[in-house]
From Swiss-Prot:
CDD domains: UreE
Keyword Cell cycle set for record: no
Any one of the GO CC terms: cytoplasm
Species annotation: Burkholderia pseudomallei (strain K96243)
One GO MF term attached to the UniProt entry: nickel cation binding
Biased composition (Basic and acidic residues): 171-192
UniProt subcellular location: Cytoplasm
Protein name: Urease accessory protein UreE
Keywords: Chaperone, Cytoplasm, Nickel, Nickel insertion
UniProt keyword Cytoplasm present: yes
Pfam family, one: UreE_C
Region (Disordered): 171-205
Domain of life from the UniProt record: Bacteria
Family, as annotated: Belongs to the UreE family.
Length: 205
């Protein structure tokens, strides 16, 4: 089994034809955050990924195997939420609440993308955002990290945490009465970009 142990720095220019010929390693976001991983190239070859601790791979990265061969990284399609809003203030509030939980977010033009999470989908809907489930590559802003930590020093912590706790309790069977319909109709035109994918599943359950 070959070992992939190096990543070529983004500022190193490689011939496009050389990269295009390299086999792809298609990984979801969680897998791209792991520095030690048993993986399978798109060719079917099993490989071992052994990179420096803390390495987060991005779509388009080029790796080097122990035999000198190149491997290109591709972001896999995965379940995500596309978050839009009727105005900039609502979208900003949605981004704030996600950031307060250290939720990895990909920022697009008038849209936020995050990993699928029914609890967060419910919270964002209550904030006034439109939430759409889709299957698409996910590449959050560099430096983002997960965890959902609580920040007691934040001025809006009590209100923010109370809302999140209410949603959490309802999704775990305590009280599941909602005053809104989870299904959303989307009449907007699709534009290609970070927040566009085809074959969407509208609404969330």
């Amino acid at each position: 089994m070959r070992t992939i142990d190096k990543r070529i720095a983004p500022n190193v220019r490689l011939a496009a034809t050389l990269v295009a010929r390299a086999p792809a390693l298609t990984l979801a976001y969680d897998a791209r955050c792991k520095s030690r991983l048993a993986a399978t190239l798109d060719t079917g070859e099993d490989v071992a990924l052994v990179l420096p601790r803390g390495t987060v791979l991005r779509d388009g990265d080029v790796l080097v195997a122990d035999d000198g061969a190149l491997v290109r990284v591709a972001a896999a399609h995965e379940a995500v939420l596309l978050v839009r809003a009727p105005d900039a203030l609502t979208l900003t509030r949605a981004a704030y609440h996600l950031g307060n939980r250290h939720t990895p977010v990909e920022v697009g033009a008038g849209c936020l993308k995050l990993e699928y999470d029914p609890v967060l989908a419910d919270m964002l809907t209550r904030l006034g955002a439109t939430v759409e489930r889709a299957s698409a590559p996910f590449q959050p802003e560099a430096g983002a990290y997960g965890g959902g930590h609580r920040h007691g020093h934040d001025a809006t912590f009590a209100e923010d945490y109370a809302l999140a706790q209410q949603v959490f309790d309802e999704h775990h069977g305590h009280s599941h009465s909602h005053d809104h319909d989870h299904d959303h109709d989307h009449d907007h035109d699709h534009q290609h970009g970070p927040c566009c994918s085809h074959g969407h599943h509208h609404g969330h359950r």
